[in-house]
C-alpha cells in the first residue's frame, strides 16, 4: 500500500525564496551570491503492506519529518519515487489545516474537507469526533484559544475517526495528558486491527515497540536499517548507547 524506492530529498538554501528578492539581486550584483545543497533524506527504500504500522526513529535532523511530507504528497522527492494506494490522513503539524479565528465546530468541518470528506459524512462523524477529543464544552470556542493539548486531541480525533486507508502521525501521540495518550494509543490499536496502514514518528522507543511491527531508522538523512521492530529497535538503542 506504500512503496518508497530510492527516495532522496534536497533542500537548496540561499536562493531568493530564503533571502528575499532584494537581497538576492544585491548579492548577484556584488558577486556575493552562493547557494548550498542539503540532502534531508538520501536513498530511502521500504515497502508497507495493508495493516502494517511503521515506526520511524532517529535523532533530531535525521530527516523523519521531511520523509513524512513526501509520503503525504506535500513534497516531491528530488530523486526516487513514492507510491501510495488509498486515502491518506496526515498529522504532521498540529495546527496545519486549522484556522485560528474559526470555532472548533467550523474547524472540524474544514479539516474534514481538506481530507476530502463530504459535509454529509462529517455530519455523521461530528459528535463522535468531539466526544473523543473531549471538547464538548468548547465547540463554539475559537481554535486559537485552545491549549496545545486540546488542539492535538482535535487533530488526532479527526484524522483517526474519518477512516483513512493510511494514517501518518508525527509525534502526535506524545502530546496531551496521560489519559488521552492512553486513549489515543488504544485507538491506534483499534485502527490497525481494522486494516489501516500507519506511520508513526516518535522519540519514544517504548511507544514504537508497543504499536509498530516494522521500523525504519534514519540518521542524518541516511537509511541505517529497516525491518522488524525488535531487531531494528535493539540495534538503534545500542547505537544510541555507544554515542553517549
Label every PLM stretch briefly.
Residues 220-221, 236:
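Conserved ABC ATPase "signature" C-loop
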Residues 208-210:
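A short, surface-exposed alpha-helical micro-motif characterized by mixed small hydrophobic
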Residues 202-203:
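H-loop/switch region of ABC-family ATPase nucleotide-binding domains
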Residues 57-59:
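The feature captures the beta-strand-to-loop junction immediately N-terminal to the Walker
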Residues 1-40, 230-243:
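Pre-NBD coupling/linker segments of ABC/ABC-like ATPases
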Residues 226-227:
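ABC ATPase "signature
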Residues 22-29, 109, 121-138, 157:
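Conserved ABC ATPase "signature" region
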